[in-house]
């Protein structure tokens, strides 16, 4: 394996080479598992500027980061996002620049993003029923999202992945249809267990929880699943479909099969806090460092390195228990 003498290694000897960066807390959807319907967003002066986001990305890549994922909120509602993507994609040593989107803006931005150097897209799709999609997203238009998915394919994106958060009693009866949709378009699809982030009112998390094992068992009734050793440098575990060579089915299972032992990532919130673990509040304020010491990459690098001693071995998510993390997913970076 390629080694970088400046690589980031945490206290449990895990190499940190994957950074997830939230570029905005704003979104044109209000998904029931992600944020409150009347969400109050941060004032502009409290969030990182595009230049500050780039400076953090640049420093992480210099320290051995090989994959960066831009998230939100919805990253494509941030003005200047395409130019930011182009600057980050050009950083020497970065292998992948990925972006997670709800798909609503891809009809107009898929081609510019591809041309800017974004290598892969993840697109959220929790239902193929227009009414249910509207219920789950509160404001989303299914036809617009599907048009965005198709625009991404036409732009030239490969290995585009659909993300589906599975909620028992709300969309779990659509699992097979969602896989068939992915097969038709030669997409990957990942089913995600809901994470206990933020206080929500639309459903009781303990009652809506659907484990990855249950999802996989249902899919196995319709498809031949072959376990794969492939990795996307993230937490998903993949299965191949004997019936469809161009589609992989993944599972992200923070509850039933936590992936902490091999965790290789940290997250930057839009307000500049470096989160060492999705399931803990341990963080370091990089915005303060950036603004107190402008143009000083050495101070930023020291803050990043010093933060690693805060990274815990694992999270302690519990199904149906009290909400352990009060921040919403749109604040964390979905």
From Swiss-Prot:
Domain of life the protein comes from: Bacteria
Chain residues that bind [4Fe-4S] cluster 1: 27, 31, 34
Domain Radical SAM core: 11-236
UniProt record, GO biological process: Mo-molybdopterin cofactor biosynthetic process
Class of this enzyme: lyase
Matching InterPro entries: Aldolase_TIM (IPR013785), Elp3/MiaA/NifB-like_rSAM (IPR006638), MoaA (IPR013483), MoaA_NifB_PqqE_Fe-S-bd_CS (IPR000385), MoaA_twitch (IPR010505), MoCo_biosynth_MoaA/MoaC (IPR050105), rSAM (IPR007197)
Annotated GTP binding sites: 20, 69, 100, 161, 265-267
Keywords assigned by UniProt, alphabetized: 4Fe-4S, GTP-binding, Iron, Iron-sulfur, Lyase, Metal-binding, Molybdenum cofactor biosynthesis, Nucleotide-binding, S-adenosyl-L-methionine
Biological role: Catalyzes the cyclization of GTP to (8S)-3',8-cyclo-7,8-dihydroguanosine 5'-triphosphate.
Name of this protein: GTP 3',8-cyclase
Organism this protein belongs to: Pseudomonas putida (strain ATCC 47054 / DSM 6125 / CFBP 8728 / NCIMB 11950 / KT2440)
């Amino acid at each position: 394996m390629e080694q970088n003498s400046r690589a980031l290694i945490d206290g449990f000897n895990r190499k940190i080479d994957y950074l997830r960066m939230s570029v905005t807390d704003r979104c044109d959807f209000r998904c029931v598992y992600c944020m409150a319907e009347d969400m109050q967003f941060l004032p502009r002066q409290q969030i990182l500027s595009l230049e500050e986001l780039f400076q953090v990305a640049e420093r992480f890549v210099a320290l051995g980061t090989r994959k960066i994922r831009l998230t939100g909120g919805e990253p494509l509602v941030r003005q200047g996002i395409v130019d930011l993507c182009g600057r980050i994609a050009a950083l020497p040593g970065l292998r992948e620049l990925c972006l997670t989107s709800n798909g609503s803006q891809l009809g107009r931005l898929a081609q510019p993003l591809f041309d800017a150097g974004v290598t892969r897209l993840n697109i959220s799709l929790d239902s193929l029923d227009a009414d249910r999609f509207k219920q789950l997203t509160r404001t989303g238009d299914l036809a617009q999202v599907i048009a965005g998915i198709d625009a991404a394919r036409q732009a030239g994106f490969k290995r585009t992945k659909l993300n589906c958060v599975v909620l028992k009693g709300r969309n779990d009866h659509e699992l097979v249809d969602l896989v068939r949709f992915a097969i038709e378009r030669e997409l990957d699809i990942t089913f995600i267990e809901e994470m206990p982030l933020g206080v929500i009112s639309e459903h009781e998390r303990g009652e809506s929880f659907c484990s990855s094992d249950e999802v996989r068992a249902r899919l196995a009734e319709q498809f031949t699943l072959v376990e794969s050793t492939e990795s996307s440098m993230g937490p998903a575990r993949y299965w191949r479909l004997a019936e469809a060579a161009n589609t992989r089915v993944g599972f992200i299972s923070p509850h039933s099969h936590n992936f902490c032992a091999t965790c290789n990532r940290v997250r930057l919130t839009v307000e500049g806090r470096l989160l060492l673990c999705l399931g803990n509040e341990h963080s370091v304020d990089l915005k303060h460092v950036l603004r107190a010491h402008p143009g000083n990459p050495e101070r930023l690098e020291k803050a990043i390195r010093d933060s690693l001693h805060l990274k815990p071995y694992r999270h302690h998510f519990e199904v149906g228990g009290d909400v352990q993390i009060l921040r919403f997913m749109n604040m964390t970076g979905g």
